[in-house]
Amino acid sequence: KLLTWEDVIASNYKETVANPASGDVQIWEITNKSGGWFHPVHIHLVDFKMLTRNGKPVFSYEQGPKDVTFVGENETIRAIMRFGTAGDPTTDGRYMIHCHNLPHEDHDMMTQFRVGNDVDRDPAYGPDDPQNANCNDPINADPAGASPA
C-alpha cells in the first residue's frame, strides 16, 4: 500500500527531536554510536553547512551546501542550518531526518523535526510554492563563516 500524508496524520505519531521556529538558525550535532555502521544522514527541508567532523575542520569537499552528510562509525559532525524565513508560515510543519542506507531506512532509522506549530501541515509543496525559494540559505547565516567555540 502506498502511504499518504493522511496516513501519517492518522498514525498520530508526533514525537520530534527538534522544534525550531521559522527562520531560526541552529547548530545540530549528529553522533554515530552504532558500532560498525556508517550512515548517510539526510535532513529534509534545509541545506546545511558542515562546521566540524570529530571536532576538526571538515574536508574541502564537505564545505558546500549539503542535505546529506556521511557520518562514519564513532563520528560526530556539527552542522549549521536555517529553517526557512522568519515569519513565513509556509515552512511550518513536520520534516523527516533519515538514513539513506536503504536497509536502515526500511527498518525505521528515521525521525522527524517540527518547524513552527502547524504539526499537521503537509510538507509536500509544489514547485512554485514560496517555501522552495526560502529554505536554502544557511550559507548566509551570520555564524556560518566561523566555527563555534
What is each stretch, according to the model?
Residues 26, 39, 93, 97, ...:
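Residue-level detector of short, conserved catalytic/binding motifs and their immediate flanks
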Residues 109-121:
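Short beta-strand elements
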Residues 1-85, 117, 128-149:
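Edge beta-strand plus adjacent loop/short-helix module at the start
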Residues 85-95:
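Short glycine/proline/serine/threonine-rich loop/turn segments at secondary-structure transition edges
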Residues 31-33, 100-104:
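Beta-strand-rich extracellular modules
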Residues 35, 88-89, 105:
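Short glycine/serine/proline-enriched coil/turn segments at secondary-structure junctions
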